[in-house]
């Protein structure tokens, strides 16, 4: 039963990270379409924001694996 819970936690963390990055990329594409001259600035912010959006799911997956292997 614990394995199922850990699998669900890891899966939901991965889905959450993917949705977060997709929202960031969508906003950058919309911003670039509105103001093409700001493309560089928006890309830089995206390259900073995407890893931040992925950090929490990565930590959640690490915690799930720790619970699996240690518990």
Curated annotation (Swiss-Prot):
Transmembrane regions listed in the UniProt entry: 5-25, 47-67
Give its localization: Cell membrane
Q: Which InterPro entries match?
A: ATP_synth_csu_bac/chlpt (IPR005953), ATP_synth_F0_csu (IPR000454), ATP_synth_F0_csu_DDCD_BS (IPR020537), ATP_synth_F0_csu_sf (IPR038662), ATPase_proteolipid_c-like_dom (IPR002379), F/V-ATP_Csub_sf (IPR035921)
Q: What is this protein called?
A: ATP synthase subunit c
Which residue spans adopt a coiled-coil conformation according to this UniProt entry? Answer: none
Q: What does this protein do?
A: F(1)F(0) ATP synthase produces ATP from ADP in the presence of a proton or sodium gradient. F-type ATPases consist of two structural domains, F(1) containing the extramembraneous catalytic core and F(0) containing the membrane proton channel, linked together by a central stalk and a peripheral stalk. During catalysis, ATP synthesis in the catalytic domain of F(1) is coupled via a rotary mechanism of the central stalk subunits to proton translocation.
Similarity remark: Belongs to the ATPase C chain family.
Q: Site positions for Reversibly protonated during proton transport, renumbered to this chain? A: 54
